[in-house]
C-alpha cells in the first residue's frame, strides 16, 4: 500500500466533498471552486511512477453562482454532474467527452441552476440513484425529500416527514429498490421507490441513531444486503458510547455485526468499497469472501478500513490528518481510496491485490444482488393510473365518485379509509407541481332495528345435557328515551355504500372542456350562509362568470354532460342546469345520500348509498330505464352470514357511456354493464379469463399507454389473425378494453398477475383439463362479441367475429361455425341494437369477409363452400 498526501493549491478554502466518477476524482471547494483529477495519475504518483511536481488537475472551474457559498454535495454520472450548496443545486451536463474520455472545457458544459431554497430551509443532502435515474434532495425545516428525474429534472414526487424530525442524510440502494433516510429524531426510515417516483414507507427501524446537523457520507454494501447504521445508541447505557451496526436487510434489518472502536464514536463518513473481495486459503483449499468499509470520525483525522469477515481493522491510518476527514470515496475497481481533510489535503491510499484480496467480477455481485429479498411491486397512485386518453364514448369524472367507494352488502359494518385523489398537474418554472383535493368518505350506516338482531337460542331444560353447568343469565339492556332516530330506508336496506364527506370548497372541470370550471363553496347548509355554485369560463387567462346560484344545502358531488351541469346535495337532491344557468328541471329529490353521480352525453347516472341506480335522459327528461339496483353484483349469496353486517367488494368505477349504458367495476376485477332491454346486469370482464384465455392482454393496464388504434374500416381481405388481434388490443376507444384494463389493475394490486403463467402450466398438465385453454379462449371471445352488440360497436363486433370464426375453423368446431354462419346469413336484424346493426346487409357483408378469410382452412371447407355458393362468391 502507498499513501499520497497532497496539499491542494487553494488559499483560504476548504474542500467539503469529493466523488469518484469514471476515471476522475471530482473535488468541490468552499468558494464554489471545482477541480477534477485523473485517478490513475494520483495512483501513479503514489507508486513513484509520476513525479509529484508533474501532478496537476485535469480541469478547474468556478461554479456559476450569484453569492458565493460553500459546496457540500457533489454527485452524478458520466453525463451530468450535480453540485450543491446548502441553498442551491446546479447541474453540469456534457462535462465528460464520451469519445476521448476527457473532461470538456467549461465553455462546452451546459450549466443550469436546478433548484433553490431560501432560508430558513436548507439542503441537508443530495443523492443520485443511477439505477432509477432519480435525484433525491433532502430539505430541513420543510422536512421533506424532493424526487427529481435525471436529465429533465422534472419533479416526480415528494416524501413528507413528520414535523418533529428533519432529514439529515440519505442512503442509496445499489439495486434501486429502497431509499433510507436518517433523521434528527434518531429514527431510520426505509422507503420503497420505483422509477416513477412512487414511494412507500416499508420500515421504521428501532435501531436509534444519534445524528448531529453535519453532512454525513454513508453508503450500502455493493450486494445491497447490508445497511450500515453509524452512531447507533440502541441499548447503550447513558449513551456513553456509540457503535456502528450493520443491519441485514434480508433478515428484517436485524443487527448482524458491530464495529466498536474509539474512532467510530461520532462516525461521520462510512463508505463501502464497490468491489467484493475473495482471499483464497491455499493450505485448506478454501476461500473467504468479504466487503471492505472505510470509516472516519467527525473530529479526528483517523481513517480505518474494515474487513467485514473479521470485523477488525484491516488498515488503521491513525490521525493521518490533524483535522477532520470531510469525505471519502473508493475507485470503481476497489483498490484506491480517496479522502479529503478539512485542511484541503487530498489523500490517496493506493492498495494492491496482495493488500486487500482478489476483487470478484461485477457479474458475481449482480448474482448476489439477485439473491436478496424481492419487494412487492408498488401500486401506482390513482391519478397516475388514469390513462391519458379515455375512450371517446365513456367519461370518468374528476369527482368524488371516481374514487373507490367502500360498500356493504346487505349488512355492512365499516367503510374504507379516506382516499386522496390527485387532480391537475401544472408546470411552474420547469417543475411539475401536483394540486390535490382530498376526497373522504363517511362510513356506511350499520344501524339496524333492535328487533332484527339475531339472538342466540335460549337454553331450555329439555336441551341441557345432564351434568352441564347452568348458564348465567345475561343482563337485559335498559331502554332510554330520545334514542337515535333510525331512517327506515337505510336501516332496512340490504346495501350500504359510503358517501362523500363535505368539503369546504372544491372545483370541477370536465375532461372535454378544461376551460370551464364549476366552483363550489359550501356554506353552513342553511339560509344564513348558503352554498355558492359558480360556473366560470377561462379564455386567454381571463375568467368570465357564466352563471351563479345560491343553494341552502351542502354540495358533495358535481358532474357535467354535453349540454348540462349537475350537482347533488348531502340529503339526496339533484340540481340540473344548462350552460347558461337555466334550470332544466326542478330539483330531483331522492331522499337518501348519493355515492356516485356521473354524466356523459345526454345521460345522467346516479347511484345512491342504498344501491339504487337511476339513469335519466336529460334531453328527453325521462328515465332511460326503470330504477334498478346493484345488489346482484355484490355476490349476496357468498356474503351471507349469521351476523347482521358483512363486508362486500368495493365499487371502483361507476360510469355511463354516451349511449346510456351504465358501467360498474368492482375491487375483485369484475366489470359489468346494465342491459336496459333485459333489465339485468351483464358480465363484461372476468378475472378468470386472464388465467385461461389466449386473447387476454395482461400488459393492458392504466400504467401503460397503448399505441394509437387503427380506426379505419376493417378490410375483409386481411386474413392475418395476429394483425386483427393487435388492432383490437390497441383500440383506445374500446370500452371492453378499458374494463379489461381495470381487471388487470386489480389483479396487479392483489399480486395475482405474476401467477398466471404458472397457473396455466400447472392446470393444463392435470387430467381432464387438456383442452381448457381453447374452451376458455372461445368463451372469452363469445362474451366480447355479445357485449360489443349491447354497446352498439359494429366496428369492434366485426373484428371480434372475424377472429372468433378463424379460431373456430382452426380448432375444427364445424357445428358451432355452421351455427354462426347461419345466424349471419339470416335476414333478421340483430335485435335491440342501433341503425348500424339494423342494416339488413350488415351481417351478409360481414359473412362474405369471414368466408374469404376462412376459405384456405381445409378442415372447414365443406361448410364455407356451401355458404360461398349461396352468396355467389364462387360458382
From Swiss-Prot:
- What does the annotation say about its assembly with partners? Component of the HIR complex, composed of HIR1, HIR2, HIR3 and HPC2. This complex may consist of one copy of HIR1 and HIR3 and two copies of HIR2 and HPC2. The HIR complex interacts with ASF1. Interacts with SNF2. Interacts with SNF5. Interacts with SWI3. Interacts with RTT106.
Q: Phosphoserine occurs at which residues? A: 713
Q: What else is known?
A: Present with 922 molecules/cell in log phase SD medium.
Q: Alphabetically list the UniProt keywords.
A: Chromatin regulator, Chromosome, Nucleus, Phosphoprotein, Repeat, Repressor, Transcription, Transcription regulation, WD repeat
Q: Does the keyword Transcription regulation apply?
A: yes
- Please list the GO terms describing molecular function: transcription corepressor activity
Q: Which SUPFAM superfamilies does its entry note?
A: Putative isomerase YbhE (SSF101908), WD40 repeat-like (SSF50978)
Q: Null-mutant phenotype, please?
A: Abolishes localization of RTT106 to the HTA1-HTB1 promoter.
Q: Where is the composition biased (Polar residues)?
A: 424-446
Q: Where is this region: Disordered?
A: 398-473
Q: Which family does it belong to?
A: Belongs to the WD repeat HIR1 family.
Q: What are the ranges of the WD repeats?
A: 10-47, 118-158, 163-201, 237-277, 278-316, 320-359, 546-587, 589-626
Q: What does this protein do?
A: Component of the HIR complex, which cooperates with ASF1 to promote replication-independent chromatin assembly. The HIR complex is also required for the periodic repression of three of the four histone gene loci during the cell cycle as well as for autogenous regulation of the HTA1-HTB1 locus by H2A and H2B. DNA-binding by the HIR complex may repress transcription by inhibiting nucleosome remodeling by the SWI/SNF complex. The HIR complex may also be required for transcriptional silencing of centromeric, telomeric and mating-type loci in the absence of CAF-1.
Which cellular compartments is it found in? Answer: Nucleus; Chromosome
Annotated InterPro entries: HIR1-like, HIRA-like_C, WD40/YVTN_repeat-like_dom_sf, WD40_repeat_dom_sf
The biological process GO terms on file are: chromatin organization; chromatin remodeling; negative regulation of chromatin organization; negative regulation of transcription by RNA polymerase II; negative regulation of transcription by RNA polymerase III; nucleosome assembly; transcription elongation-coupled chromatin remodeling
Tell me the protein's name. Answer: Protein HIR2
Sorted alphabetically, the Gene Ontology cellular component annotations on this record are: chromatin; cytosol; HIR complex; nucleus
